[in-house]
């Protein structure tokens, strides 16, 4: 992403996802200012979740697409989808903010979950969203990895305290790298 590079091939195909090679070769690219780019995600999974208690809570207090309103997560619907079930989590983090576990300015911690296994793995937690990161800047990427993991640990603690079935849970793993959604456009 930065530093000295040499490309010696006669022809290249830019498959970087960020138009890195196209930009270096002088192609016309555009990139919004960091504050205008889509937020990045830090994905993670938890283990030690009581599946039965977690699913019972989900059924007792189901989240819908209407619950996505506000914060970083918003979804535009025609209205008919508003009452449909969605694997969305916001309430544990709102409670954590109210109790001072999560700072008020981090009201962006919320999002979706994937599956909960019989072994107690709660997977594909897409709860941490970081604004103003330029995915073509190594310093921004490093800052995002550090801050994203810090926020993920807050999210794990909030889930343990405020989401039934997660009382004995712990971090299982992080995704390989921060999820960047938008950089350069050709």
Q: Where does each model-flagged region fall?
A:
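Flavin (FAD/FMN)-binding glycine-rich loop and adjacent Rossmann-like elements that form
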Residues: 2-11, 15-186
């Amino acid at each position: 992403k930065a530093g000295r590079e040499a490309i010696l091939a006669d022809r290249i195909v830019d498959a970087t996802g960020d138009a890195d090679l196209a930009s270096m070769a002088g192609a016309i690219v555009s990139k919004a200012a960091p504050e205008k780019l889509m937020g990045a995600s830090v994905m993670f999974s938890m283990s030690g979740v009581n599946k039965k208690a977690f699913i019972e809570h989900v059924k007792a207090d189901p989240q819908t697409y209407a619950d996505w309103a506000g914060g970083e997560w918003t979804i535009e619907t025609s209205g008919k989808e508003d009452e449909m079930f969605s694997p969305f989590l916001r309430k544990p983090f709102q409670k954590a903010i109210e109790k001072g576990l999560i700072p008020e300015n981090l009201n962006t911690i919320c999002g979706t979950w994937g599956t909960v296994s019989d072994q107690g793995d709660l997977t594909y937690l897409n709860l941490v969203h970081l604004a103003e990161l330029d995915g073509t800047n190594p310093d921004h990427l490093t800052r995002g990895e550090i801050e994203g993991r810090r926020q993920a640990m807050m999210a794990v603690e909030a889930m343990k305290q405020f989401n039934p079935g997660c009382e004995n849970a712990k971090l299982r793993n992080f995704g390989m790298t921060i999820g960047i959604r938008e950089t350069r456009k050709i």
